[in-house]
Amino acid sequence: MTDDKDVLRDVWFGRIPTCFTLYQDEITEREAEPYYLLLPRVSYLTLVTDKVKKHFQKVMRQEDVSEIWFEYEGTPLKWHYPIGLLFDLLASSSALPWNITVHFKSFPEKDLLHCPCKDAVEAHFMSCVKEADALKHKSQVINEMQRKDHKQLWMGLQNDRFDQFWTINRKLMEYPPEENGFRYIPFRIYQTTTERPFIQKLFRPVAADGQLHTLGDLLREVCPSAVAPEDGEKKSQVMIHGIEPLLETPLQWLSEHLSYPDNFLHISIVPQPTD
């Protein structure tokens, strides 16, 4: 992979200032103060909210506490979506800090998966990494790794250790020089305007004539509504890690540098702000 390490670091250390507030109907023994935290964009809510859980449990009776879950403006937050994706999709046009409501009751069974422990997060994460490598390398790279390498990937993410993670992840971002890129680009496109969870299709980083495909090429093929016509008004923002990449950016470069730790490009399509 091309070594733009500053880009990798900027992506890894992206943070979202967040204010956690206990839901008003939760029963407490005294007033629950809000809890402020800088959330890592690349991580998952269930990995980084132990302090939030302990903070609010201090003012609650044990019998009033069940499985914790989070909500933003009425929308339950999926723990298996990376934090940065959740923010870009649901709150990118709102003022900071991001205001998240904490619940300990009335778990929304229809909207969220249960997360009994961090092992569930690890299993989901590794499943995504393996799926991504199947697309990129026919699973050859991930299958050649030892179990300790898989564990190092996970521990690097869980403990927020950039070098620990990238020592292993770098292998997943390599490809034979004669091929100019991966077999297929692991991506998922999310929209707030549809009930469909996401769009995911097979898409090669290099065209048949050898030209590098761009982000715009991908969108025009799989989600044309996200791209404004040449003479038309821009109605959508295309966001990855809180930024709007140029549509001319090569997809291979984006996959190497702006993928989340699960090795997928998580692309949010949100309405263009009106102000």
Swiss-Prot record:
There is a cross-link at K130 (Glycyl lysine isopeptide (Lys-Gly) (interchain with G-Cter in ATG12)). Transmembrane segments: none annotated. It is found in: Cytoplasm; Preautophagosomal structure membrane. GO terms for biological process: aggrephagy; antigen processing and presentation of endogenous antigen; apoptotic process; autophagosome assembly; autophagy; axonal transport; blood vessel remodeling; cardiac muscle cell apoptotic process. The modification N-acetylmethionine is found at M1. It is a peripheral membrane protein. PANTHER family: AUTOPHAGY PROTEIN 5 (PTHR13040:SF2). Forms a conjugate with ATG12. Part of the minor complex composed of 4 sets of ATG12-ATG5 and ATG16L1 (400 kDa); this complex interacts with ATG3 leading to disruption of ATG7 interaction and promotion of ATG8-like proteins lipidation. Forms an 800-kDa complex composed of ATG12-ATG5 and ATG16L2. The ATG12-ATG5 conjugate interacts with RAB33A; this interaction is bridged by ATG16L1 and promotes ATG12-ATG5-ATG16L1 complex recruitment to phagophores. Interacts with TECPR1; the interaction is direct and does not take place when ATG16L1 is associated with the ATG5-ATG12 conjugate. Belongs to the ATG5 family. This is Autophagy protein 5. It comes from Rattus norvegicus (Rat).
